[in-house]
Amino acid sequence: MINGTGPMHPASPLTTAVFSLGLVLTAGLGPAHAAGEALLLIEADSGKVLKAENATYPWYPASVTKLMTAYVTLSAVKEGRITLDSPITVSPNAAAQQPTKMGFKTGTVVTVDNALKMMLVRSANDIAVVLAEGVAGSVDRFADEMNRASARLGMTQSNWVNPNGLPADDQVTSARDMAILARALLVEFPEYNGYWNIHAIKLGKRIIRNTNSLLVRYPGADGMKTGYICASGFNVVASATRGNRRLVAVVLGASSSAVRAAKAAYMFETAFNSNGLNWLMPSSGTVYGLQPINAAPPNLHEAMCGKQRRRPAAEAADEDEATGSDEQGLASVFSGAKGYGPK
């Protein structure tokens, strides 16, 4: 049995922070890579765009792919094809996936509910395949379902070939598409909001903490998923709520997990304090109106994992594990920021 938990420790002063762009750039976290980043902030209820920068450039999704895996899985539950209690089995193919993973042996049986928790908290690549095979019978058939769902949602820049986001040239998305997906999850499946906000899971005596540091460091953060491979840089799709207003932020291609979290938090904080006005974008419309750019996705492998990087990140390792001391860098951003009280 896997138990999901809320915060693992009381809120500290680090969790009440305001971000400034200057602070992020001077916190010793390293400059943004030459290819830039993709940034997008929308209102979850309306889809209104509050900020967009490179939001329609194609990008490698890495583990934010798992949000689409969750969407297809929850759709199958809604359709009655499976239930959250349905048993699914770890196949040899699932067990052979690269880290990050749970590492279960072939033949291990888990429920759909527990598999979703492990995939979303641990970012377990093996469990994403377990879900795919359990829902559709094979990874290829599940990828077909992912692509059909993308087409139905209007995610015109996305193509999926696997359920976990491990490196694949043909697996692409954009900040626009990921914001559309995040909004669909929140609007279509409000009863499953708890999946995006699990701070940690307990497996036996083992405590596994969520890779999304915003959940315990930014007040009001309540989802959703991080991602990293060398080609993509550090990605996050995040949500946060203050009062009755919920926002979705997408950051693709950040130079570290610390920068990724800080930029998402900065967008949240700026928007929450803007009295509902668009931030520097008075006529940006909704996320569905953003025009896709026809281009190849940037490949950040050299910038993220090349020899010139002081601490090259590992290709197969996911999230904060890939950067070792990035969490210390993130702490320096928070500790240097001004405090504020909830609105």
What are these regions (language model features)?
Residues N3-V18:
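Bacterial N-terminal signal peptides that target proteins for export
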Residues P13-T15, S63, G220:
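Hydrophobic alpha-helical transmembrane segments of integral membrane proteins
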Residues P10-L14, T111, S138, S256, ...:
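Secondary-structure junction/capping motif
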Residues P7, L25-A27, Y60, A254-S257:
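A general, composition-driven signal for non-globular sequence regions
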Residues M155-N159, P163, P167-V172, R176-K343:
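Domain-terminus/edge residues, biased toward the C-terminal soluble/receptor-binding domains
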Residues T16-G28:
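Bacterial N-terminal signal peptides
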Residues A11-P13, A34, A38, Q98, ...:
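Hydrophobic alpha-helical context, especially transmembrane and signal-peptide helices
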Residues T26-R176, L186:
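Active-site-adjacent loops and short helices of periplasmic peptidoglycan-processing enzymes
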